Amino acid sequence: GTVNPLHELARRARAVGARFVVDASQAVPQLPVDVASTGADLLAFTGHKMVGPTGIGVLWGRYDLLEQLPPFLGGGEMIEIVDMASSTYAPPPARFEAGTPPIAQAVGLGAAADYLSALGMENVAAHEQAITAYALESLKAIEGLRILGPDVPVDRGGAIAFTLDTLDGLEVHPHDLMQFLDSRGVAVRGGHHCARPLHKRFGVQSSTRASFYLYTTPAEV
């Protein structure tokens, strides 16, 4: 749930000649994001985390960089000229969209984007911050619970990862906690959350993550 300093990370990447790729799947649904101003060379996010359908996402990239990338799938619409001896590829983005597109998912993603725009991303972000602040204060009161990352809402999105120890100092495995909470009708996730190296950085095997969104109420927290 940490809000990362993208401009500083972009500067460091450029200083060593590296490409800067941003996974914004958690940020785009929750915060106003001006993609072009992030300093990213490539930025991606998914539909299902922003009240959209599964099976679709967005990749934004600098056009000059996209032109250098070869296609990763073959099929209709991604070629420019084909003969028996050679072929050339269509310019971006067509070269990356081979075959029949996910039409229903694209319509659903567009509807989700329109819905969030109508709500106002500033309003979504304000709600997220209020819910996250309430959750942080509630979690801090639990003995043996350790919050991973910043403990103030201004530096976080609507996700909080934590570990839990018993009063005897024994670690409660996130999968056990997840199953226990599930039996009480509470949905959390246990594991690495696609970030195993980060867990090693924090010195923990795995964690439990509670995620909040625009429909979450204080009573549910």
Task: Give the positions of each predicted feature.
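Pyridoxal 5′-phosphate
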Residues: 1-221
